[in-house]
Structure formats: structure tokens, C-alpha cells
């Protein structure tokens, strides 16, 4: 490296721009200086800057895919309470989050259970993990996507709109139950399911089991056909647990009903306020009792005077 001819930095910068190597463009001067000082062979220098370019491309790709995925914020596998949903195997979920074979086959994931059981959280968390592992994901409320597809149908662009969704390895349809039992809505949903069958994967969250899907699809034949396509090559999670939101609300209520038993620096003011409130209530009660007693004595005296 020491005997290399002088490099025109401006020319090299232009070349790297043309080659679309922004990380190398930024990093090469520092690594070139280090290579000169430490006597790196040319192959090592090229290897190091190429690795940094690939790492930066991965970072930018994940950033782009996260932006397009529309995932709800804060939903990760680390924050999912697996202990509250014992029927869901954490090991199985982690294997699913890696993607690989099931996405390549166009297999599906179906999550059933009552509202508040963590279906949407788990679906979004799996989606996030898949993006980090190099897959493309889109998360949408089923009603919103169906409305977009209806607009595309009116504009004679339904086939094109469905084809554009092929770029996503996984399409997450959240809250299937809220699609209205309307022929126009359910027909475009069925066409989407049919178009992705064994080609691209779908993940669905729903409050009702398959036996109640006649509330979504008005035509029994369409219901049967949709279920058949979804369950073929599918993994099904039945998350029949108490609502997480309800559990949290009840726990918060219980916590509010438990006053601190001793004062600390942090809660001393709260303890004093509580005690003052109790004192005021006691005084008010005493005054009320005195007033009642006075009124009683007055009535007795009045009767005696008669």
C-alpha cells in the first residue's frame, strides 16, 4: 500500500458515486490511512471496506422495509408476554420469526382468540423479526386493505393492485372479523387470498374461529373455499386467554386500592395528603354527628314544652 501511486480523491469519489458505494466513499480515507500504517495487503483493505459497504446496505434495507411495513410501534417478541399465553410455544414462534422455509413455500399463519389476547402484538412482533432477517412484510387492518382493493376494482385496477402486494413475502391482515358481511368487500378479500395461495404468505388475526366465518363471507361456498386455501400449509395459534387490557386495568385498579403502609422520601407527601384527607373526613363526620345530636335534642325539648 505504501508504494501505491497518488490517488485523486475527487476522481475516486466520483467513481464511487457512479458505482453506488456510499459507505466506501465515506470510509475509505480512514481505512487507507490505517492500511498504510499497519502494512495491510490490498486484499485485506478491499475486504474490510467491502464488508462495511454490505453492512450499511443491510442497515438501509431494513430501514426502508420497516418504513413500508406499517407495523404498530413497540411490538416486539421481547415484550410479548409468552407466560400469559401458555398455549403458544415460544420456541415455535422463534422458529417462525426466522422465516426461511415456510415463507418460501407461501405458507400461512392464523391467530385466533378473543379481543385483547395479544394476537396483533404477536403478529406485529413476528413481522418485525422477519424484516430484521431480510424479508418484506406489510401490516394492515383488513378493513383498510379491503377498502383499497374495492377502490381498485371500481377503477378496473384490482388485478394490478393485488399484483403489487406480491413484493411482500408476508401480508399481515389484522382483525379479519371487522370486515362487513358484504358481497363487494368479501369478494375482493377472497380474490386476494386466492391470488396469494401457495405463492405468498398471509398472516391473519381474527376473533372468530372458522366455524363463525359465515359472519364475514355471505356465501357458504366462498367461506369454504377461503378457509381451504388458508389452512393448507398453515400454522394455527388459538390464543383463548383473558384480555391483556382487562388484566392490566384490573391490576392497576388493585394497585390504586393499596395505600402505602409506610412513608418514604418519594411517597411521604402522598401519605401526608391521605392522612389529612382521613382527618378531614373524620372531622366532617364528627360535625355531622354533633349536628344530628343537636337537632335530636331540639326536637325532644320542643315535644316536652308542648
Spans of model-derived segments:
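Conserved P-loop
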Residues: 88-167, 216
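Short hinge/gating elements
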Residues: 11-14, 30-34, 79, 108-112, ...
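N-terminal nucleic-acid engagement/recognition segments and initiation subdomains in replication
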Residues: 1-40, 290-292, 296-306
Amino acid at each position: 500500500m505504501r508504494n501505491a501511486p497518488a490517488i485523486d480523491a475527487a476522481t475516486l469519489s466520483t467513481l464511487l458515486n457512479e458505482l453506488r458505494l456510499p459507505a466506501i466513499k465515506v470510509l475509505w480515507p480512514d481505512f487507507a490511512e490505517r492500511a498504510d500504517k499497519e502494512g495491510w495487503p490490498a486484499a485485506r483493505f478491499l475486504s474490510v471496506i467491502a464488508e462495511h459497504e454490505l453492512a450499511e446496505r443491510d442497515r438501509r434495507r431494513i430501514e426502508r422495509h420497516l418504513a413500508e411495513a406499517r407495523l404498530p410501534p413497540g411490538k416486539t417478541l421481547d415484550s410479548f408476554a409468552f407466560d400469559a399465553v401458555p398455549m403458544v410455544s415460544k420456541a415455535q414462534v422463534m422458529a417462525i420469526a426466522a422465516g426461511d422455509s415456510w415463507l418460501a413455500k407461501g405458507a400461512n399463519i392464523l391467530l385466533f382468540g378473543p379481543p385483547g389476547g395479544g394476537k396483533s402484538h404477536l403478529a406485529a412482533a413476528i413481522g418485525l423479526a422477519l424484516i430484521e432477517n431480510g424479508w418484506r412484510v406489510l401490516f394492515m387492518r383488513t378493513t383498510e386493505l379491503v377498502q383499497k382493493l374495492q377502490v381498485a376494482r371500481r377503477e378496473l385496477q384490482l388485478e394490478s393492485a393485488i399484483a403489487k402486494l406480491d413484493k411482500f413475502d408476508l401480508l399481515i391482515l389484522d382483525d379479519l372479523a371487522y370486515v362487513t358481511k358484504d358481497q363487494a368487500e368479501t369478494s375482493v378479500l377472497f380474490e386476494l387470498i386466492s391470488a396469494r395461495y401457495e405463492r405468498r404468505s398471509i398472516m391473519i388475526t381474527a376473533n372468530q374461529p372458522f366455524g363463525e366465518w359465515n359472519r364475514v363471507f355471505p356465501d357458504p361456498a366462498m367461506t369454504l373455499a377461503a378457509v381451504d386455501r388458508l389452512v393448507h400449509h398453515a400454522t394455527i395459534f388459538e390464543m383463548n386467554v383473558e384480555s391483556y387490557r382487562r388484566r392490566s386495568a384490573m391490576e392497576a385498579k388493585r394497585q390504586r386500592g393499596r395505600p402505602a403502609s409506610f412513608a418514604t422520601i418519594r411517597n411521604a407527601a402522598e401519605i401526608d395528603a391521605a392522612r389529612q384527607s382521613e382527618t378531614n373526613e373524620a372531622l366532617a363526620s364528627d360535625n355531622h354527628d354533633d349536628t344530628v345530636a343537636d337537632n335530636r335534642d331540639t326536637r325532644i325539648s320542643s315535644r316536652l314544652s308542648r
